Amino acid sequence: MEQVSGMTNTRRTLALALAALPVCALAGCSDDPASTTTPTDSTSSSSPSPSSTSSDPPTDSEVAEQAATQLATDYFAAVDHVRQDVKEPLKQLMKVAIGGQLAAQELLTRNQHKVGNRQVGDTRVVDIVIQSVNLDNSDPTAGRVPTVQMDVCWDVSDVDVVNSQGKSIVSPDRADRGWTRFTVANHRWKAQPEDGWRISNGQDLKKAPCSAA
């Protein structure tokens, strides 16, 4: 996203930046780097690995994958809600994001509300591909906590952003679908192995968008 500081007309520049709606503006990506190469051992959330028997309890890795998959949907829903209604408290984002991702999303939403813009419509999650699961929880105080890396294909064809006069500011060149790679971390793994997950950063991927479902 283009920097808006240093411009002579901050209000107009920010409105134009929001109108362009790059992927990270919608996904709320932080600036943390992430690899864009796709590991060969990835699995799609739509095709869960079969267990040996139906009575086998899920492994820790499977629990982490399921939690991350649900979090992707919850994350976009929370982002949509706070951008659609200025009265929605930003603290709701703390339930789905943490660290740089949370800070980036809070800043973007505050700036959007400040200039009178708001979102209309909901983002749709089309596909989720789990890239890796690392359950190392050896040093939580140093940030060494369980993580899941996942690629999410989103669809914003039903999403618009309007200004205070109700006029759309979305660029006609906006891509309606694309991929973002998210890192999901659980800093409360021992106490909350299922619901302690939060998105810590995200990065757009330069690859062909998924097909609309």
Question: Can you describe what each PLM-predicted range is?
Answer:
Residues 2, 12-13, 17-22, 29-52:
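Short, low-complexity, disordered segments immediately C-terminal to signal peptides
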